[in-house]
Design a protein with these regions (language model features):
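Active-site beta-loop-alpha junctions of metal-dependent nucleic acid enzymes
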Residues: 1-20
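Short, surface-exposed basic-aromatic patches at helix termini and helix-loop junctions that form
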Residues: 23, 41-50
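Short, conserved catalytic/metal-binding motifs centered on acidic residues
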Residues: 26-34, 51, 127, 149-156, ...
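Acidic, metal-coordinating catalytic cores used for nucleic-acid/nucleotide bond scission
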Residues: 29-37, 57-60
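A short acidic (Asp/Glu
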Residues: 37-43, 62-66
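An anionic, glycine-rich sequence signature occurring as long contiguous blocks
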Residues: 50-158
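Short amphipathic alpha-helical "interface-anchor" segments enriched in bulky aromatics
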Residues: 136-170, 175, 179, 183-188
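A short, flexible helix-boundary coil/loop motif
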Residues: 186-235
Length: 235
């Protein structure tokens, strides 16, 4: 299913219920390029103060970026990149939005910048927003924080069984998800302490690495003395 399938009406229902039933004011909204459409942006803008949506690039837009001269060098995520802002007036009629553009040099496997006959080859990333006051670095940093939240779901899905829920009803599955979420917090505490004494493990090691060192034990059945003996390869 296309990521935009019923996304606009789903967002509209969720935001309306949050604001009307809970009395919550939605301050900021951020989403990836799957939400980059006129209908979704109009719905979001009406229901929150500021939004930050990854803009889809196209060939003509990248060519426009190459013509820009006023780039500022900043550090984002411990890496240097160039940033600038341009006004986007032709996306929705009567509306003017800010397009925050980030460019990073394309590098080969040895870390060397790639070039062509026109100079350094850049990778461009854009964020569409109605925030005209924050700096480009602040906007990019805030948008990138959504990746940390997605990683939490990746860990829960692959390490703690959320991708294969054990029950047929949501009530039971909700209990399972809450318990495994608490177990994940306990595991993070455990791995932080164990990693200080067990060298192969790190504070960021996933559950699979922990199982490999502490739970999984290689073994082999061997024939000796006219009987089968289970040989454990462990200390």
């Amino acid at each position: 299913t296309n990521v935009r399938f019923h996304q606009e009406d789903t967002l509209r229902r969720i935001m309306d219920r949050v604001t009307s039933e809970l009395g919550v004011v939605i301050e900021r909204f951020r989403a990836d390029c799957g939400s980059f459409s006129k209908e979704i942006i109009q719905t979001v803008e009406q229901r929150c103060n500021t939004f930050y949506i990854r803009a889809a690039n196209c060939g003509s837009r990248c060519e426009d970026f190459r013509q820009l001269k006023e780039w500022k060098s900043v550090e984002v995520g411990y890496e240097r990149c160039d940033v600038t802002s341009v006004s986007m007036d032709d996306f929705i009629e009567g509306k003017s939005y800010r397009l925050v553009v980030q460019r990073s040099p394309l590098k080969d496997k040895d870390g060397r910048e790639q070039t062509d006959m026109f100079g350094v080859i850049y990778t461009y990333r854009c964020i569409l927003t109605n925030n005209w006051t924050s700096t480009e670095k602040d906007i990019i940093t805030f948008y990138n924080e959504r990746g940390a939240s997605e990683k939490n779901f990746d860990i829960q899905n692959n390490d703690f069984g959320w991708s294969h829920l054990p029950f047929s009803f949501m009530a039971e599955n909700m209990v399972f998800m809450m318990v495994t979420a608490m177990l994940k917090n306990f595991y993070l505490y455990l791995i932080r302490n164990i990693s200080e004494k067990v060298k192969p493990l790190k504070k960021t090691s996933r559950l699979k690495a922990f199982i490999l060192h502490f739970v999984s034990v290689p073994a082999k059945w061997v024939r000796t003395g006219r009987q089968n003996v289970l040989n454990l390869y462990t200390n």
